[in-house]
């Protein structure tokens, strides 16, 4: 999928949380209705078969419960995309990445080979399944891992065993760490821990630009990789460093810097970092330190100020506001306004922002913020993933267009607003601000309810310990603490209240923008009938 990702380390976020976020964008010319669901252990398959690649994988017993945002239409598979499990581990999968011919020549993709002929006849060749891909990743990994690091290890092992038919980037987070994994060819992979004080921007391009192979093949403190990566690089002459003392650069070795990258990928990283580090360097003009087409925009950077949930939503909704490249703007001309691929694009399916908060008890530590549809015109609102069911307004997405579920209502609103951007912009902004404030208020109020419910637990721990974690626990203890039926009922009730308020406000926005755009129709006539 064509997506955009931002990862925010705990010391770079406004409240000490780890934050991972990704737009899921459908392919050009397609829309992909999404659902927000809880997958219970008895609903998780024990034997999995991919729809696209036909690969079959036996899965462990005793999976953890987890949230997901799968397709409403399962004809191409589940595509779970984003979720949080009972160990308070979050996963976002995947960001489609680019590569190069040298990598694919050395380690080809593992693609489905259809059967030839008919079984029993001369010349028959049976089908050869492909590897695993975005369709499968969340389902195969998230229910079975108890830390972000375990997520990297499990996905890496699956990639080495089954291979993949596409290049992908995947984020994992827990309360302490964020890890970013990038696939390399058919069977190889690298992963790097996001620095606590930094954020990471990822368009659809292999991004890691500095990698410690000794650490990855040794202690794995900040880096991990497939077991034979060093030999793979050396055997296929993939390290392009001029000097031996230069840190290994995976972006040069495994990635791309094509003409299409310069209109589709690098401008997105440029705009996100331009917004989050406005004073760090010169961003505009001929003397800019980095142009939108630069191939060396850093993978990770320390922000000029702490990053909020609203900052994450803004950059993942952006269409180059304040630059000549804004398709809705008045700067530049028709050529520049359609020069680069916006981040907030028409074919956005969903945005999930997963926040793991160290200052909350384990039972309500995780928050999954959700938006559906095209980001410039939608809103991002919070839901607690530690529940046994999700609100119907977000879960019961149909393949039929209707204003009765959140996905399609947002899709309709976006189409109306695009046609009358300037005239509807104020209504959309008021809606986003109001629903965002409602979301923060819901989280705060629910936190208070949980505090009263687990007061004895909170008093037991020192909130000022060296990690800032008010309830530090081993993974198995986290799972036990999270499986609190009474707390789950409180969180589910809060989610239902949020969804009801969200629907009321979204209905009002639809009413408003439908009226405005209808009044702007080209067949209107301002003289009253007489």
Tell where the protein language model's regions lie, with residue ranges.
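Glycine-rich, aromatic-lined ligand/substrate-binding cores of catalytic
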Residues: 230-364
């Amino acid at each position: 999928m064509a997506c955009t990702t931002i990862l925010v380390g705990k010391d770079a976020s406004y409240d000490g949380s780890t934050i991972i976020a990704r737009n899921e964008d459908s392919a050009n010319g397609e829309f992909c209705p999404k659902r927000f669901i809880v997958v219970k252990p008895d609903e998780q398959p024990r034997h999995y078969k991919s729809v696209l690649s036909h690969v079959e994988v036996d899965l462990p017993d005793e999976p953890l419960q987890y949230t997901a945002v799968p397709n409403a239409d399962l004809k191409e598979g589940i595509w779970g995309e984003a979720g949080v499990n009972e160990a308070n581990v979050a996963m976002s999968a995947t960001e489609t990445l680019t590569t190069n011919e040298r990598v694919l020549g050395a380690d080809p993709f593992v693609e489905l080979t259809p059967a030839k002929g008919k079984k029993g006849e001369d010349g028959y060749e049976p089908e050869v399944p492909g590897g695993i891909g975005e369709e499968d990743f969340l389902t195969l990994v998230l229910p079975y891992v108890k830390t972000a690091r375990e997520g990297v290890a499990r996905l890496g092992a699956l990639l080495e065993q089954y291979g993949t038919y596409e290049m992908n980037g995947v984020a994992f987070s827990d309360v302490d760490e964020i890890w970013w994994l990038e696939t390399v060819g058919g069977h190889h992979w690298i992963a790097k821990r996001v620095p606590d004080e930094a954020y990471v921007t990822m368009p659809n391009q292999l991004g890691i630009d500095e990698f410690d192979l000794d650490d990855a093949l040794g202690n794995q403190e900040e880096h991990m990789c497939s077991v034979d990566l060093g030999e793979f690089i050396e055997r296929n002459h993939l390290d392009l460093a001029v000097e031996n003392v230069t840190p290994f650069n995976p972006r040069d070795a495994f990635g791309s810097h094509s003409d299409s990258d310069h209109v589709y990928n690098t401008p997105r990283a440029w705009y996100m970092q331009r917004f989050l580090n406005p004073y760090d360097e010169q961003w505009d003009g001929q003397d800019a330190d980095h142009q939108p087409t630069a191939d060396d925009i850093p993978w990770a950077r320390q922000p000029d100020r702490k990053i909020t949930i609203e900052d994450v939503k803004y950059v993942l909704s952006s269409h180059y506001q304040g630059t000549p490249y804004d398709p809705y703007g008045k700067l530049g001309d028709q050529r520049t306004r359609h020069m680069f691929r916006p981040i907030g694009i028409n074919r956005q399916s969903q945005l999930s922002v997963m926040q793991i908060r160290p200052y909350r008890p384990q039972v309500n530590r995780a928050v999954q913020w959700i938006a559906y549809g095209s980001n410039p015109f939608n809103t991002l609102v919070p839901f607690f993933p530690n529940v046994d069911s999700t609100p119907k307004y977000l879960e019961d997405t149909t393949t039929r267009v209707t204003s009765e579920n959140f996905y399609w209502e947002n899709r309709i609103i976006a189409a109306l607003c695009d046609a009358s951007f300037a005239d509807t912009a104020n209504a959309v902004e008021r809606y986003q601000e109001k629903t965002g404030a409602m979301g923060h208020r819901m989280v705060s109020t629910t936190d208070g309810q949980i505090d009263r419910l687990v007061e004895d637990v909170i008093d037991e721990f020192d909130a000022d310990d060296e990690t800032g974690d008010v309830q530090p626990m081993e993974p198995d203890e986290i799972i036990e603490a999270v499986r609190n039926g009474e707390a789950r009922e409180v969180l589910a009730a809060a989610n239902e209240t949020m969804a009801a308020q969200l629907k009321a406000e979204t209905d009002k926005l639809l009413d408003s923008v439908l009226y405005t755009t209808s009044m702007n129709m080209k067949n209107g006539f301002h003289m009253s009938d007489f």
